[in-house]
């Protein structure tokens, strides 16, 4: 439940730490805003507070054109702690209902359509399809404000199959025609540049150094202020570069994709890789219950995501019982040998099919580890890999550490405790009393805090 007084103080002070944690509906104008909206604050008796943008929209409010709620970071708190609902929301945000049916989504979740509708009504007050349409319209609004894409391309990128359907849905959800948001003509560009926001603080220096120590040349790149890599999503391929802009509490992300139909899920994936939606104040309050009072907590620490669970699994196998530097060498050789070349002398991460078809003789490691890697790749080719990497321990050579690492970095699961990790063991030995159970459901962040020592 939202605390009205806390919300009032946050909106009057425009506290960026609350951005995306609630939204402000203004009764006199019929619009809803972020708590950081630069407009003159309305009177208390003209305000209603909502836990999410979708809740504000359901109540009949339209998004503000000045603070742009479509650009706000999300808060995982508003859809509760229900695991199935979390998965459903994540898949819908990645475009699961753009081209596929509700039945296909339910098959992926292992539940019936009626049960999924019930979950959405109970927790969100909206049907799954209505939620998906709301997300599509907000993403389209973000593209209209920030990109130079033609409106027809924006409709396609937002998951609409026709321009007419897009225009109708946009008018209903935003209250205006899409063309009215294009106030200033700009030269068109093949690339898409978006500002992706987070709630401060954000420990960019920690994340930057973590990624740099594991960066694979020609697949990834980075420097003091940016991180980028080549990516694939289904049949689409491209690359992105994210530049940290701390004064705006966000990243300026430039994307190049050969199929704009993949843009919505790719942007959602970039948000996950950079962990932009984490509520670090909430997380760190829980971690302090598990750690000694003198522990030097890294404020704003984020989960360093990988592009896919499969890539995370491959890197976990290649990192078994070796140093970070040695693991990086193994992954580099794999990418050089099997990664699909890109047009700019880069490489994509190797597909499961190419790894499964190779004898991997170029990898200097025990044969059992090569067999494990090929077994993982073959399972992916055969569609035998569970969506949750923690279930991969049935595969020969995949133990709890590898499965947990793949879940932590490949799906950004927030509650992975790698208690058997050597770095964690060393930290525990130095600290003495640590209570991992007290950090639930944020033990992934506890693991990373211990790695930071």
Model regions and ranges:
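HhH-family (HhH-GPD) DNA N-glycosylase catalytic core used in base-excision repair
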Residues: 1-453
